[in-house]
Amino acid sequence: MATSISRRQFLKASGLAAASACAAGLLSSCGGSSSAGSTGGSASGSVDTTKYTILYSSQPATLNYLTTATDLEMVVGANCVDTLVEYDNKGVMREGLATSWDWDADTLTWTFHLREENWVDNNGEVVAPVTAQDFVDALKYVLTPDYASSNVGLVTAYVAGAEDYYNYYVYLNNANTGVVDDDGTTYTADASGVVTVTSSDGTAETYSPVDFDTVGIKAVDDHTLTYTLTYDFPGFLSLLCYLPYEPAYGPLL
C-alpha cells in the first residue's frame, strides 16, 4: 500500500508514553537538508515537494521510534524526525539539527550546537521549539527499563554512566517484582532503594540508587548539547543517526 506523510506533520504514536496513547512530533526539515519529494507527479508533471511517499508491506505495530528495532517502524522514525547529524546521498556526513560540533579528547565529550527548529502538530502548526533538553528527555526514556527499548545497547555501551543507570533500574524492578533468574540469582531492595543482588552461591553485591544526572548527556542551554563517552569511540557521530539518539518532545513522554 502507499501512504503520503508530510515532513512537518505530527505522528500519532501509540506507544510513546506509558499509557501508549501519546504522540511523537515531527521536526521541520533542516535548512541544510534536501527536501524529500513525492515519487509521483500530477497530470501537469509538477511534483509536490512537501510530501514524502513511502511504500510498505504492512502496518507498523508502533510509531515509537525510541523503542522499536523493526525495520518497517524504524523507517518511519528515520524519515520523520531529524537527527543531530546525517549522511547525504553520497555517504558524506553533514549537518542535521546540529550546525557544528566539537570533540574534547581530554574529557571524552562531544559538544553540539543546535539550529533553531520546531515541533509541529498534525496541522503543521508550531507547538514548541526543539531544544537540547528534548534529546536528554528522549535518552532518559530509552534508558528506562519500563519502556523496554530494543535499542538501549546502542546507548549503554558508549555514553558514560548510562549502563550503571539502566542496570540499577533493571535490578530495582527485579526486586520489586520478585524476579529470580534461571541461575538462582535473587534481588532485594531496602527502604532507601539500595538493591542487593545475591547469586546462587551466596555471593552478594549491592547497588545504590543512581540519578540520571550521572549519565553523560547534558543540556548546557537550549541550543547546546553534550555527550560524554565511556571511551574514545570513533564511530559515535555515525551512532547519532540511529533512533535512540533522536529527540522527543518532553511533555509528551
Task: Map each language-model feature to its residues.
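N-terminal secretory signal peptides and thylakoid transit peptides that target proteins
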Residues: 2-21
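Short, well-ordered beta-strand elements
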Residues: 48-58, 109-112, 225-226
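Surface-exposed binding/hinge segments that line
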Residues: 134, 141-253
